[in-house]
Curated annotation (Swiss-Prot):
Residues 413-442 are annotated as: Disordered. Signal peptide: none annotated. Gene3D superfamilies: PPM-type phosphatase domain. This is Probable protein phosphatase 2C 52. Residues 413-429 have a biased composition (Polar residues).
Amino acid sequence: MGGCVSTSSKSTCSSWSNGEKPVRRPYLGIGCCVSKRAKRTFSDHIVSLQNLTSIPNRITSSSKSRSSCIFTQQGRKGINQDAMIVWEDFMSEDVTFCGVFDGHGPYGHLVARKVRDTLPVKLQFFFQTLQSKQNCSKGTRFRRNSSKSAVQEAVKEGSDEDKLKGLWGEAFLKSFKAMDKELRSHPNLDCFCSGSTGVTILKQGSNLFMGNIGDSRAILGSKDSNDSMVATQLTVDLKPDLPREAERIKRCKGRVFAMEDEPEVPRVWLPYDDAPGLAMARAFGDFCLKEYGVISVPEFTHRVLTDRDQFIVLASDGVWDVLSNEEVVDIVASATSRASAARTLVNSAAREWKLKYPTSKMDDCAVVCLFLDGKMDSESDYDEQGFSSATNAVESDDGQRSEPCLQRNFTVRSSSDQENETYGNVNTETDAEDEKTVGDQNWLGLQGVTRVNSLVQLPRFSEEKSKT
């Protein structure tokens, strides 16, 4: 991936001083190279992205790894717009990166997959850059100060855990910002009215770092004092009606309100047009709303894991629409095998969709289950034949299958007799009834009407409205 990446949790860092040999110092469990000769450049990103498919311990399609399993199933709304990733040995042996990305809009599936592939590389790059700068600054300061005063200053700076939190926090912020900037300037991907959520976690030893935008969610399954499983929500669903989110959007002249036929779903609208109706306050892409309060700044949190913590579940809102946190934890904990936990959870969500909302179209579902003890089942019951045929029909994560690129429709709900009218290109590989829409959180059955995360109607910037 460029630079010096340790293959051990006890990695070291090198620095040159007056032509002497490199002095190696352990620092925060992740190795880096502070020599100017080994400084990473943007070209390293290109090389990294080109070699993604050959990286070991990185999975992006329904499968399992040493300590995790992932599964996705296409809903009844067109091409699967969900993407997911588990990357073990991420920079070092004790680091694991996981993420779920739920796309929305005409090209949401392409945005979600672009973020899935690029964001981890950017996160790695910014962490190593920040770590190198901090180590160089630390080395200069120690040479200038006496030994006693240097030690005292190091104590004042705080523990390694605090430093680690600060580094990862800044790396998450910078990588999310850089990811959104790359989407804005992408020559072949129209993100004006398309975007993606992003719930990501990074586990390093007992430290858990989380960066989240949108309404995908991460939860923690733990044992209480009675050895009963309990659920803890790790991230906040960043909806437009949250006070701090609504305040920011309104301050930027955006509007937040719900439609009459779905009063429980607040949406973000342009100042002078009832478009695009985004059902979240933060997202990658969606540049038509970036000047009106929608941001790509992640909510970053840190948690120290304990021996009672058993597993972490990341999922798109297709799961959370029909299952509670407690139900998800119970389903994963009671799965016949760890390798099949993600698939079992998606199948349970699919059944709930049919029972609770028989007239509604099921949303895409994507699940990542990370088991914190690092163990999986010895038997392999997660073969390819167990996967949904719908999943296989749309997955092209590794570039082995081509899909109809930029072929996703979107639905504009304008009147009762045009509820399912579609605009854009038609995907010939799906049934005509499969409108290309994406569901959002807490969906109520609406007599078969599909609810979408973004009511993508091209904005009409009329002068008459701007004057009123």
